[in-house]
Protein backbone atom coordinates (compact mmCIF):
# COMPACT_ATOMS: atom_id res chain seq x y z
CA UNK A 1 0.00 0.00 0.00
CA UNK A 2 2.84 2.41 0.84
CA UNK A 3 4.45 1.73 -2.52
CA UNK A 4 1.15 2.43 -4.30
CA UNK A 5 0.77 5.78 -2.49
CA UNK A 6 4.41 6.69 -3.18
CA UNK A 7 3.99 5.90 -6.89
CA UNK A 8 0.72 7.87 -7.00
CA UNK A 9 2.39 10.90 -5.41
CA UNK A 10 5.28 10.70 -7.91
CA UNK A 11 2.89 10.46 -10.86
CA UNK A 12 0.85 13.44 -9.69
CA UNK A 13 4.00 15.46 -9.07
CA UNK A 14 5.32 14.62 -12.54
CA UNK A 15 2.03 15.71 -14.12
CA UNK A 16 2.28 19.15 -12.54
CA UNK A 17 5.86 19.50 -13.81
CA UNK A 18 4.88 18.62 -17.36
CA UNK A 19 1.86 20.89 -17.16
CA UNK A 20 4.00 23.80 -16.02
CA UNK A 21 6.44 23.24 -18.85
CA UNK A 22 3.91 23.23 -21.68
CA UNK A 23 2.28 26.46 -22.79
CA UNK A 24 -0.23 24.55 -24.93
CA UNK A 25 -2.08 23.48 -21.77
CA UNK A 26 -3.47 27.01 -21.48
CA UNK A 27 -6.29 28.13 -23.77
CA UNK A 28 -7.59 31.52 -24.75
CA UNK A 29 -11.10 31.36 -26.17
CA UNK A 30 -10.63 27.58 -26.57
CA UNK A 31 -7.54 28.24 -28.74
CA UNK A 32 -4.09 26.97 -27.87
CA UNK A 33 -0.57 27.01 -29.24
CA UNK A 34 -0.13 24.22 -31.78
CA UNK A 35 -3.80 23.91 -32.74
CA UNK A 36 -4.87 24.71 -36.29
CA UNK A 37 -6.63 27.88 -37.36
CA UNK A 38 -8.36 25.68 -39.96
CA UNK A 39 -10.53 24.34 -37.12
CA UNK A 40 -12.22 27.79 -37.10
CA UNK A 41 -11.93 29.20 -40.59
CA UNK A 42 -11.46 28.07 -44.18
CA UNK A 43 -8.17 28.80 -45.96
CA UNK A 44 -9.99 31.40 -48.04
CA UNK A 45 -11.32 33.20 -44.95
CA UNK A 46 -7.87 33.20 -43.36
CA UNK A 47 -6.11 34.51 -46.46
CA UNK A 48 -8.74 37.21 -47.09
CA UNK A 49 -8.50 38.53 -43.52
CA UNK A 50 -4.85 38.15 -42.57
CA UNK A 51 -3.08 41.26 -41.36
CA UNK A 52 -0.66 43.10 -43.60
CA UNK A 53 1.34 45.08 -41.03
CA UNK A 54 4.48 42.92 -41.07
CA UNK A 55 7.20 43.76 -43.63
CA UNK A 56 8.84 40.42 -42.87
CA UNK A 57 6.40 37.77 -44.14
CA UNK A 58 7.80 34.85 -42.08
CA UNK A 59 4.68 34.89 -39.89
CA UNK A 60 1.12 36.04 -40.52
CA UNK A 61 -1.62 37.13 -38.13
CA UNK A 62 -5.37 37.48 -38.10
CA UNK A 63 -7.63 39.28 -35.62
CA UNK A 64 -11.29 38.59 -35.01
CA UNK A 65 -14.03 39.10 -32.46
CA UNK A 66 -13.92 36.70 -29.54
CA UNK A 67 -15.80 33.45 -29.87
CA UNK A 68 -16.89 33.72 -26.23
CA UNK A 69 -17.80 36.58 -23.90
CA UNK A 70 -14.52 36.31 -22.02
CA UNK A 71 -12.54 38.49 -24.47
CA UNK A 72 -13.38 41.32 -26.86
CA UNK A 73 -10.73 40.52 -29.43
CA UNK A 74 -8.54 37.58 -30.43
CA UNK A 75 -5.36 37.65 -32.48
CA UNK A 76 -3.54 34.54 -33.64
CA UNK A 77 -0.36 34.09 -35.65
CA UNK A 78 1.11 31.22 -37.65
CA UNK A 79 4.16 30.57 -39.78
CA UNK A 80 3.18 31.82 -43.25
CA UNK A 81 4.63 28.73 -44.95
CA UNK A 82 2.65 26.34 -42.70
CA UNK A 83 -0.19 24.85 -44.76
CA UNK A 84 -1.82 23.58 -41.54
CA UNK A 85 -1.94 27.10 -40.04
CA UNK A 86 -0.72 25.92 -36.63
CA UNK A 87 -0.92 28.72 -34.09
CA UNK A 88 2.35 30.03 -32.65
CA UNK A 89 0.72 33.02 -30.93
CA UNK A 90 -2.71 33.33 -29.34
CA UNK A 91 -3.66 36.66 -27.76
CA UNK A 92 -6.89 37.63 -26.04
CA UNK A 93 -7.76 41.27 -25.44
CA UNK A 94 -10.32 43.00 -23.23
CA UNK A 95 -10.95 46.70 -23.80
CA UNK A 96 -10.66 48.86 -20.68
CA UNK A 97 -12.53 52.05 -19.75
CA UNK A 98 -10.39 52.54 -16.63
CA UNK A 99 -6.68 51.79 -16.84
CA UNK A 100 -6.51 51.18 -13.07
CA UNK A 101 -8.91 48.25 -13.52
CA UNK A 102 -6.51 46.95 -16.13
CA UNK A 103 -3.58 47.08 -13.72
CA UNK A 104 -5.67 45.29 -11.08
CA UNK A 105 -6.53 42.63 -13.66
CA UNK A 106 -2.80 42.01 -14.26
CA UNK A 107 -2.41 41.25 -10.54
CA UNK A 108 -5.47 38.96 -10.47
CA UNK A 109 -4.41 37.00 -13.54
CA UNK A 110 -0.80 36.84 -12.29
CA UNK A 111 -1.98 34.97 -9.20
CA UNK A 112 -4.14 32.57 -11.23
CA UNK A 113 -1.42 31.83 -13.77
CA UNK A 114 1.26 31.42 -11.11
CA UNK A 115 -0.85 28.64 -9.63
CA UNK A 116 -1.80 27.15 -13.01
CA UNK A 117 1.71 27.02 -14.46
CA UNK A 118 3.62 26.66 -11.19
CA UNK A 119 6.05 29.28 -12.51
CA UNK A 120 7.00 32.55 -10.86
CA UNK A 121 6.40 35.56 -13.15
CA UNK A 122 8.82 38.38 -13.82
CA UNK A 123 8.48 41.64 -11.95
CA UNK A 124 5.85 44.03 -13.32
CA UNK A 125 7.52 46.36 -15.80
CA UNK A 126 6.21 49.64 -17.26
CA UNK A 127 7.78 51.66 -20.02
CA UNK A 128 6.66 54.38 -22.40
CA UNK A 129 6.40 53.64 -26.11
CA UNK A 130 5.40 55.92 -28.99
CA UNK A 131 1.69 55.34 -28.28
CA UNK A 132 1.54 55.54 -24.50
CA UNK A 133 2.49 53.32 -21.56
CA UNK A 134 2.99 49.55 -21.79
CA UNK A 135 2.89 47.54 -18.52
CA UNK A 136 3.47 43.79 -18.39
CA UNK A 137 4.62 40.65 -16.61
CA UNK A 138 5.99 37.50 -18.26
CA UNK A 139 5.85 33.83 -17.43
CA UNK A 140 8.95 32.28 -19.00
CA UNK A 141 9.04 28.54 -19.70
CA UNK A 142 12.15 26.36 -19.91
CA UNK A 143 11.25 25.75 -23.57
CA UNK A 144 11.61 29.47 -24.30
CA UNK A 145 7.86 29.90 -24.78
CA UNK A 146 6.27 32.79 -22.92
CA UNK A 147 2.96 34.05 -21.56
CA UNK A 148 2.69 37.84 -21.32
CA UNK A 149 -0.03 39.60 -19.31
CA UNK A 150 -0.18 43.29 -20.18
CA UNK A 151 -1.99 46.62 -20.29
CA UNK A 152 -1.71 49.22 -23.03
CA UNK A 153 -2.52 52.72 -21.79
CA UNK A 154 -2.79 54.80 -24.97
CA UNK A 155 -2.23 58.55 -24.95
CA UNK A 156 -5.32 60.73 -25.46
CA UNK A 157 -4.17 61.85 -28.92
CA UNK A 158 -4.66 58.29 -30.20
CA UNK A 159 -8.43 58.51 -30.07
CA UNK A 160 -8.87 55.52 -32.41
CA UNK A 161 -7.15 53.29 -29.85
CA UNK A 162 -8.74 52.02 -26.66
CA UNK A 163 -6.81 50.93 -23.57
CA UNK A 164 -6.65 47.16 -23.51
CA UNK A 165 -5.76 44.25 -21.22
CA UNK A 166 -4.07 41.37 -23.07
CA UNK A 167 -2.89 37.83 -22.43
CA UNK A 168 -0.50 36.52 -25.08
CA UNK A 169 0.75 32.95 -25.51
CA UNK A 170 3.87 32.92 -27.70
CA UNK A 171 6.30 30.27 -28.84
CA UNK A 172 10.04 30.83 -28.54
CA UNK A 173 10.54 31.13 -32.32
CA UNK A 174 7.69 33.60 -32.76
CA UNK A 175 9.00 35.76 -29.90
CA UNK A 176 12.49 35.74 -31.41
CA UNK A 177 11.03 36.85 -34.74
CA UNK A 178 8.95 39.61 -33.10
CA UNK A 179 12.07 40.93 -31.39
CA UNK A 180 13.82 41.17 -34.79
CA UNK A 181 11.61 44.16 -35.73
CA UNK A 182 9.46 42.61 -38.49
CA UNK A 183 7.34 45.78 -38.93
Model-derived regions: residue spans:
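Compositionally biased P/S/T/G-rich terminal and signal peptide-adjacent segments
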Residues: 61-86
Amino acid sequence: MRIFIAVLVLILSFQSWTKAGDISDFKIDDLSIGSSLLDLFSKEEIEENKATYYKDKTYSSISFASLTEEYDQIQVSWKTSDSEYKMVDVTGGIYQDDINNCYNKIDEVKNDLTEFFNIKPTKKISFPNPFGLYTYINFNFNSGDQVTVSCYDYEEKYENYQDIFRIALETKDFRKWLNSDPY
